[in-house]
């Protein structure tokens, strides 16, 4: 058997903000620079430090992960995207020390050819997860991030009009439902309103210089995403509705 480091729990001064980035490959950093630490959570961490905030940013993104599916996941029947958000919530969020804020970017894989969920099912999944977080970690601020476009992606599982329609419905929910204490509009940052696709400058893959897949942003895309996050929203007092 193999042993892997799962996490490092560190002593920190009282009041240190702990921000969890929860999501799929676009949080994990697919298409960023290999060993470059230029994913959007890395960008956020550096911005916080530069602004004088001693904060911890924890990346719990998993490539291929979904909010609701697949329902049949089990250790005996594993799935490349791992257990869904609800199933891994205890391990990857609730059990962490000192969490003050969570940024949740997820849903595109639920609508891919690897997922069968409707927009309404993902919305309900988000409601359930947010409810569990509030019950276990009262006072934690939960930020919803709009899902970036995958329209016309060359990725085998993504790119369809149906996927994009569901994504838009989910984003409308994230922006307007009031479920979240704040909203980060990554969709607006990464998407080209003229084409509905990812902005062309965010497409070429950062490590190999390849064509990219119109699903995963490159280093420039992650930089723009990380720079778009309102630090005051993350660190200020908890709001009762999205903004």
Kindly label every feature range from the protein language model.
Residues 1-75, 88-96:
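Serine-esterase "nucleophile elbow" of acetyl-processing enzymes
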Residues 18-23, 27, 55-61, 100-105, ...:
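Structural recognition of the beta-strand scaffold that forms the well-ordered cores
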Residues 29-33, 75-78, 110-119:
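Surface-exposed cleft-lining segments at the edges of enzyme active sites
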Residues 66, 72-78, 86, 110-111, ...:
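Catalytic His-Asp segment of secreted/periplasmic serine-dependent ester chemistry enzymes
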Residues 99, 103-104, 119, 161:
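Hydrophobic multi-pass inner-membrane translocation pores used for secretion
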Residues 112, 119, 134, 141-143, ...:
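C-terminal soluble interaction/assembly domains
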Residues 118-126:
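Charged helix-capping and loop-helix junction motifs
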Residues 126-137:
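Surface-exposed amphipathic alpha-helices with a cationic face
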């Amino acid at each position: 058997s193999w042993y892997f480091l799962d996490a490092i729990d560190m002593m920190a001064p009282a009041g240190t903000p702990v921000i969890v980035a929860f999501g799929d490959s676009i949080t994990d950093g697919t298409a960023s620079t290999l060993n470059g630490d230029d994913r959007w959570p890395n960008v956020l961490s550096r911005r916080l430090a530069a602004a004088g905030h001693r904060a911890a940013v924890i990346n719990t993104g998993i490539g291929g992960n979904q909010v609701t599916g697949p329902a049949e996941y089990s250790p005996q029947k594993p799935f490349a995207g791992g257990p869904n958000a609800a199933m891994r919530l205890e391990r990857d969020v609730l059990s962490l020390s000192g969490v003050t804020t969570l940024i949740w970017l997820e849903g595109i894989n639920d609508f891919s050819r690897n997922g069968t969920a409707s927009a309404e099912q993902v919305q309900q999944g988000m409601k359930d997860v947010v409810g569990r977080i509030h019950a276990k970690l009262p006072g934690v601020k939960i930020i919803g991030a709009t899902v970036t476009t995958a329209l016309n992606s060359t990725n085998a599982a993504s790119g369809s009009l149906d996927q994009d329609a569901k994504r838009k419905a989910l984003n409308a929910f994230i922006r307007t439902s009031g479920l979240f204490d704040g909203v980060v509009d990554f969709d607006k940052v990464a998407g080209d309103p003229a084409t509905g696709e990812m902005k062309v400058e965010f497409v070429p893959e950062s490590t190999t210089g390849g064509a990219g897949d119109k699903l995963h942003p490159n280093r420039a895309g992650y930089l723009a995403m990380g720079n778009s996050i309102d630090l005051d929203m993350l660190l200020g007092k908890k709001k009762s509705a999205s903004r």
